[in-house]
């Protein structure tokens, strides 16, 4: 079908999606999008996944996008359909996930009349998206869809909303191909200033105590960026740490990886960040969970910040050398210049630095009490790690809370795009739909949602989606009967006053899985853990595992609110309440 063909608005949308390479849409029908659903019914190229809630549609699209490198596509109706999607859109915005969300709207002549299921979708989603559109002319529809995909995936990725009135979907208009629809005003800088890259290489070569600080921007750049990062880190011999969103950008099995940094990061990663003399930040944004007390953040280091989004530069932390560009281009130039100038690290200084780091490592900050009396959540994850170790096709999603931090600490990620979590917004209910999206994108893979018994209930209805489409996703619940992270902070900072953090009426998750048509498993003893995990993996259907873990276990190490990296606490013997100043409590 060539450019200039006359189609209905709904047909234009489907044709534009096909031309953008879309094979899957996550959505929920309603009156304002029925013409689009009718056009979907008449074709066989794009698969639609019917979720049970519009928030889950966006999270599933996020999981699809994050695990595949493609743009996730969402289709929802007007009014409550659009407003239900907002949480997912903000989540995608904060974690830089490319999403195109199509929303229905009341007919153009009714906009502003408080019509049935009308809301100001563009007004509501303006702060929740990278960009949004309201299309009132069917002849602008194809151009808008193509432009939305370009905006969503270029520069710093993010969600884009296209609001489409119902009469525009019925109207006939001219179809335009992607090549005719490129925006003229939006051209993000992807190639860096070479003079700055050369300066960065000089700083890198002359450093005595350097560290690479890597974020999700490396993963968003694509697999080549992760390969280049690994090459540069190994060439220099320098240590590397990653943020929560950067897990997998550098292989976890490599001795140069110090683990995750930040509030619940490793002792060695945080102290290396505090004590370094050169910090090379690649694709991270110096957020508050990483920096701790800003005025004492890595006080003696020069800081290089590589980011595709210029608005991130100097936003939270003042840096010495900003480099705007795509991580892959910048890393490629750094490697080329390092080789061309025959650069070498100061091996004597580097040995002293590594000796110090290995001294910190010897503290074994992730140690926990080993016992046969109760299942420790860390133990459950260690056994899960052992069970999935032989496989390379494993994708882990999480909900939000203690289980999320333990998963980040105890599950190693050696490749990008295998770790799916809500980092910026911290959205409970993210993990199950994200696992569904990952399973759709990777049909033969093992997709596991590590969950808490509180978080999983936010979008538990999506088990029905998994069963409808015969998706063998696994939900691995660390059930401690509490909102774990809330309880932890109430214990440590609020005098053990557990205000509304205990779940008194939990469902029987084994029976719940059975009610959905899936498989439910439970472990209450240490001796049962391995068998339950093995059965979960071997079962070719959706599974919920109820792993009954220690209800009082807290997540350590941790940096108390308002404290610096070198003031982190390693375990319950450290007094958190005494270590946290009053001004720091507002940062929790």
What is each model feature region?
Residues 13-14, 18-22, 36-40, 356-433, ...:
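Active-site diphosphate/adenylate-binding microenvironment
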Residues 2-4, 139, 175-177, 202, ...:
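Phosphate/pyrophosphate-binding active-site segments
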Residues 34-108, 110-117, 226, 267-287, 314-316, 405-483, ...:
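Thiamine diphosphate
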Residues 147, 151-206, 365-366, 570:
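Conformationally flexible catalytic loops at phosphate/diphosphate-handling active centers
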Residues 66, 217-304, 412-444, 457-460, ...:
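Glycine-rich, anion-gripping cofactor-binding loops and their flanking helix/strand elements
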Residues 11-22, 63-69, 93, 151-156, ...:
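Glycine-rich phosphate/diphosphate-binding loops that line cofactor/substrate pockets in enzymes
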Residues 103-144, 166, 246-355, 533:
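Glycine-rich, acidic loop regions that bind phosphate or pyrophosphate groups
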